[in-house]
Each structure stands twice: as C-alpha cells, then as structure tokens.
Amino acid sequence: MYKNWHDIEFPVHLPDHVDHTKVLWEPTQTKKKQAELDTLFDDKGDLKILIMNVEAFSTSKGLDFAHRFLNIFLGKALIGIDESTTIKNPTAKRTKNILTIGNLASYRRILTGSPVTKSPLDLYSQCEFLDPYHLGHESYYSFRARYANMMKRNFGGRQVQLVTSYRRLDELADKLEKFSYRVLKEDCLDLPPKVFTTRTVEMTPEQQEKYYTMKRAAVAEHDGKIMSSATALTTLLRLHQITCGTFKADDDTLIHLKNNRLTALMDCLEETEGKVIIWATYREDIKKIVESLKKAYGEASTVEYHGGVDATLRQDHIAQFQDVKGPTRYFVG
C-alpha cells in the first residue's frame, strides 16, 4: 500500500512547480538504493519526501533512518500515517516507536477510512500521535476508564479486566470533531448509485453430482481422486470450490470440473461498457478469467492483482487500469 504513495498519490497531487526529492524506503538496501536515500540529506533546498511502510518502525534499521531523517528537519517536518489503525494498539512495539519519533515532527497527520475497527478505544493511540492533549487523557488506562465499562474476570489464577460496553460516546465524538475532518465518498467522487443484479448460473451435471455427494457424505470422488472434509466449515468450503469449478483432492491434485460460470461472465461483459473490476475467490478462477479475457480482447486488455503478483508489478497494473486512454479494461483480483 505504501508504494502507492510513491507511484500514484504524490505524482497526482503534488504540484509540478514544487521541486522535490522523493524516495521509497525498502528494507533490503542495495548500493543504488543507499545512494538514493542519501539524496534526502543533500543541501539542494528542495522538498524532501521519505515514504516508509509502518512495519519498518518495528525494526531498528527503519527506526534509526527515520530518526536521522527527522533530526535534519527539526521544526519543519511533517509525518503522515496512512491507514492509521495500524497504530491502534498502544502496547505494540511499532506504535510505541512511532509515538516517540512523532515528537520530532512539528506537524502530524493521520488518514484512515475506518478509525474505529473493533472498539472506540482504538482511537487513543491514533489521537495521541497527533497530540496527547486532544483527548484530555495522559494514559490509555484513564481514557479506557472514561469511555468503557469494565469487568474483572479470573483466568488461570490471574485477574484480568474485560470491556463489557462503552459509555459517553457522544462526548468522545464531540472531542474528535474538533480536530478531525471527514470526507464521504459522495463528497469527492461523482459516482452513479450502486445497482445490484443477481445472475443465477446452473451447475453442470458433473458439478451437481459432486456437490450433493459432498453435502450428504462429506466426500466426493472424481477419476479416482477423493476429496473429503472433517468439519462442517470445511464442507462449506468444499461445496463452494465445487460450485466454482475447481477443487483440490486429498492428495493435493487440482481437479477441474466443467462449469458455466465463465461463460456467464463473458456474456455479462459483452453487455458492459467501460472499465470493469472482477473479483474472484480462488487463484485458479483468476487464472481462467484472465486467460479468457486476454484471448477474447487482447493481451493488454487485462491485468491481475493478487498476492501471487510481485508488489511492484501490482502497482503497475493499477496504473495501467486507471489510465483512461490506455488499452487495459479489465482488472481481475
């Protein structure tokens, strides 16, 4: 995600007239990368931008370099943390390191699409990074005591406190409003309303046979290959794999079943104009979809995005898809 700032966000949003040096941090450093990092310390007088992943602050190498960089610009530096829920845990090593190093920057900002993931208590470390006085609490525990109802429980001979519910959330919301800015999707994007359409795809006879056998007996057989499941959850997974047309036998053999899903997808795409994002659950499905699209619409028509694609290549694929004048129309992930 952090490479997105280097490849897309800064090039799009930083004005062309601003002279700058922009360097992407990488944990494994070659001589070329070291020389690139050294340009952040020259005296050209331009804007210096260091882009690091949050995980780097869990390492001494990343923390030391960030410390060195910020010490050069005391009183002038800004630190921004994207996806700031990555520092929501006040006891995590990287959170503690970032809170400490944040004191070297005169300006601090956070960005997130979901400041509260599980609990309002997630807000404490994020807000403390901005300014310890924003919430009016000097410690996480006083903050928790103010906004959470706690209960003591004994586990294995030791006593722990558990959150049972939350309180004074209106008060907390009022405090947040004073130093936060919320932008809704409809405020910044001109998008049509979502339209949901369900398309029913019939299973082939081969799929139906495997599906109902697995459903009844938690076992399915294909050309002598057995697929079984030991739990209800595994059975549900196997049933889903069968409906998708591909499953793994117990000996890890990949079994392909005739299915109508790909034909239904291609029919749907013939009715669609503009760019299309296609999500699939399994890598094998992605592979089949990409092959079919490239065969029908050309090699440059489709890019894929998943963990099996190199991180640098993934960013290139995003850029290709976002290029309104480019040939890439389908994004499969």
Can you say where each PLM-predicted feature lies in the sequence?
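Conserved helix-turn-beta segment of the N-terminal RecA-like "Helicase ATP-binding" lobe
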Residues: Y2-T30, L130-H134, A296-E299
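Conserved helicase motor
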Residues: K22-Q34, V54-T59, K88-T91, A280-E284, ...
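Conserved two-lobed SF2 helicase motor
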Residues: K44-K61, D323-G333
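Inter-lobe coupling linker of SF2 helicases/translocases
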Residues: D38, I51-F57, H67-F73, A92-S106, ...
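Conserved helicase ATPase motor motifs in RecA-like P-loop NTPase domains
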Residues: S106-P120
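Conserved helicase ATPase core of P-loop NTP-dependent helicases/translocases
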Residues: K33, I277-W279, K287-K288, Y297-G333
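Walker B catalytic acidic pair
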Residues: D82-E83
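Conserved Walker A/P-loop ATP-binding site and its immediately adjacent core
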Residues: M1-F10, T117-D122, T281-R283
